[in-house]
């Protein structure tokens, strides 16, 4: 059994760790609420964009789709994958789940004879692919807790341009979808070619487009894809802070349990030491009497 002094040192160390994890939990809770507000604030814009897209894509059919982001290639030979991860760890299994899903997607695509280029948002994803010898074709790191749209445009435009030039036949994004504080799950979404939103869920309004429906569509399609990427980044940030808050709360609770167990061990060790001293004194007294 460890000495009383050693156990006391461990108790002090665990209490210090618990203070740190408790502080990190409170910080993450504050950042999570802010990230949730950011996600909710962008949804009306995304919903409105989806309505306009549904109306436009229903009008533009056939040959008018060729050369646009709506065009589906007959043969898919090359795919681009955008992977969204945090810059920091200590958020449970969130990063591992996203990267595991990305790895499975890459394996599936290669099994079909397709090449895959990876673009990363966040340091964790970038470092993972660099370690595995899979250098990202583009990256964006240090996005912060409330990034602006401009922060993701460099990577987004590069990937979209790759599709427009014929370098890529499809474009996908993998990120951590925010469900609620306790649930975040890896999600994969096809970005290109753009799939027409369901027109049955939109209000049927006969808009007049200037200069033409095709020109407006060609202008709005890249913005639509950029908005989808931005929304995925915001969802991932909200998921990150939620997962970190829960992880730090669990760490704090585990530290409290460990302190309780160590305190019990300390009391037992102290009691054993006292019993030993009393026994030695009694033995010495008995020896003197005899």
From Swiss-Prot:
Task: Read off the CDD domains from this record.
Answer: F1-ATPase_gamma
Recorded topology in the membrane = Peripheral membrane protein
Q: Which UniProt keywords apply?
A: ATP synthesis, Cell membrane, CF(1), Hydrogen ion transport, Ion transport, Membrane, Transport
Instruction: List GO terms (cellular component aspect).
Output: plasma membrane; proton-transporting ATP synthase complex
**Any idea which GO molecular function terms this record carries?**
ATP binding; proton-transporting ATP synthase activity, rotational mechanism
Write out the annotated subcellular location.
Cell membrane
Keyword ATP-binding set for record: no
The reply to whether Hydrolase figures as a keyword in the UniProt entry is no
One biological-process term from Gene Ontology?
proton motive force-driven plasma membrane ATP synthesis
Instruction: Identify the PROSITE patterns for this entry.
Output: ATPASE_GAMMA (PS00153)
Q: Which family does it belong to?
A: Belongs to the ATPase gamma chain family.
Q: What does this protein do?
A: Produces ATP from ADP in the presence of a proton gradient across the membrane. The gamma chain is believed to be important in regulating ATPase activity and the flow of protons through the CF(0) complex.
- NCBIfam families listed in its UniProt record: ATPsyn_F1gamma (TIGR01146), PRK14111.1 (NF010709)
How is the quaternary structure described? F-type ATPases have 2 components, CF(1) - the catalytic core - and CF(0) - the membrane proton channel. CF(1) has five subunits: alpha(3), beta(3), gamma(1), delta(1), epsilon(1). CF(0) has three main subunits: a, b and c.
Q: What is this protein called?
A: ATP synthase gamma chain
Please give the organism.
Answer: Chloroflexus aggregans (strain MD-66 / DSM 9485)
**What does the organism's lineage look like at the top?**
Bacteria, Bacillati, Chloroflexota, Chloroflexia, Chloroflexales
């Amino acid at each position: 059994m460890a000495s009383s002094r050693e156990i006391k040192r461990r108790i002090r160390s665990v209490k210090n760790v618990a203070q740190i994890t408790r502080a990190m939990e409170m910080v993450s809770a504050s950042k999570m609420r802010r990230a949730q507000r950011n996600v909710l604030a962008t949804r009306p814009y995304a919903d409105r964009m989806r309505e306009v897209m549904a109306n436009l894509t229903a009008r533009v059919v056939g040959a008018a789709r060729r050369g646009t982001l709506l065009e589906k290639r007959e043969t898919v030979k090359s795919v681009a994958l955008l992977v969204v991860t945090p810059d920091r760890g200590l958020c449970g299994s969130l990063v591992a789940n996203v990267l595991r899903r990305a790895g499975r997607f890459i394996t599936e695509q290669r099994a079909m004879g397709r090449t895959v280029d990876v673009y990363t948002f966040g340091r964790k994803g970038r470092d993972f692919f660099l370690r595995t010898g899979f250098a990202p074709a583009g990256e964006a790191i240090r996005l912060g807790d409330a990034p602006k749209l401009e922060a993701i445009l460099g990577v987004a435009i590069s990937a979209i341009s790759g599709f427009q030039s014929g370098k890529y036949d499809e474009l996908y994004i993998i990120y951590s979808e925010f469900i609620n504080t306790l649930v975040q799950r890896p999600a994969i979404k096809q970005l290109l070619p753009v799939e027409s939103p369901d027109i049955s869920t939109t209000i049927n309004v006969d808009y007049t487009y200037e200069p033409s429906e095709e020109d407006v569509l060609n202008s709005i399609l890249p913005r639509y894809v950029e908005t989808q990427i931005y929304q995925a980044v915001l969802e991932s940030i909200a998921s990150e802070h939620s997962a970190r808050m829960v992880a730090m709360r669990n760490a704090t609770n585990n530290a409290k349990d460990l302190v309780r167990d160590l305190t019990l061990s300390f009391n037992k060790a102290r009691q054993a030491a006292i019993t030993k001293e009393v026994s030695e004194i009694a033995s010495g007294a008995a020896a003197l009497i005899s």
